[in-house]
Amino acid sequence: DQGLTYVSSFIYQGISRGGNKPYYKKTDIYVPFNSWCCEAQWQKYDAETLNLNGMVVDGFNHQGYGLNRYCYSGKGTWSTCEYLPMGIAEDRETGETYIFQVESSGQWLIEYGSAQGGNLYLTVSGATEQEHGWYKNLKPGECFTTVPAGAAVVKGGLNPAVAALT
């Protein structure tokens, strides 16, 4: 038997990699807050505000990355109870916009994080053990399929990104 506690549907390493500035000085992250009576309330945050910044000094700490993460997720059986299962990141310097969505009516997780090499990553998944108490035991010969996800990277901002995803 093999126990599963986390299986990603999509990973993108290197959001806002291009250009001259580090990602934490030029990346805006749009978070899609949602509720039954107040749907699709997108809020824009810069990466530093979400604590996805790099250390500014070299030495004991690691200059250029902080190993922090910022997550939001669906909870329970209502997949959009606090957030929509999607997100947008925009590189203000290069004009690249990254858009993605989880295509699931169940639990899901979206995670941004800083990693070695001065990169910002994104992972998209279904339910996880850490956030949702999810566990799947696979017996020999059994298969597991992750939740579907869609993603696009475009030049030109939010409108072209939304058009590419739809």
PLM features per residue range, with description:
Residues 1-165:
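N-terminal accessory beta-strand-rich subdomains and adjacent acidic, glycine-rich linkers
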